[in-house]
Amino acid sequence: MKLDGKVMPFMNPRHLVEHGLSHIPEDRQKHGLVMSYSIADNEVLCTYYQPPFARGIQRMFPAIVENARSLIKRFDVRTPGEQVPAGNLSGGNQQKVIVARELSRPVRLLVANQPTRGLDVGSIEYIHQQIVVARDAGSAVLLISAELDEILSLSDRIAVMYHGQIVAIMEASQADRSELGLLMAGSKKA
């Protein structure tokens, strides 16, 4: 894998995060959150060991709580408080917690895998806005989606895969919705 033109050797997740990789997983409940943890704890899953959230081996709870309150407000997470378990939130608010966490630190590459699957229209629009903000701030975005409208509205370039192989790469401005659908279904080769 290369990031900013530099070869990145195999790294554990902590090293990837420290090198600017952020990830919005396809399955938010299985891979994105610890459902029994509070929103505050979920917001620092990737950075709990770093200042201002820790000093040595001691966690700095006031900083963790303040971070959560700030992200709840900034990302419009609908919750009675930062100590609510993530499992008590709606799907849209769970996704906002993940997006807040992943975009609250410097991001060089955002991998967004099915970022809006199963969400309401308002949450979809909000997640799309945050992806665009990250892109406009200079982050590279790898969007993985089966939603044609999402792909066409957020992408600069589109690579279509079928059975694990890239079958076409095109500029989004040149993409045709029906052609993309055929390529995704394996009915047409570029």
Each language-model region and where it sits:
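Glycine-rich phosphate-binding loops of nucleotide-dependent enzymes
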Residues: 1-190
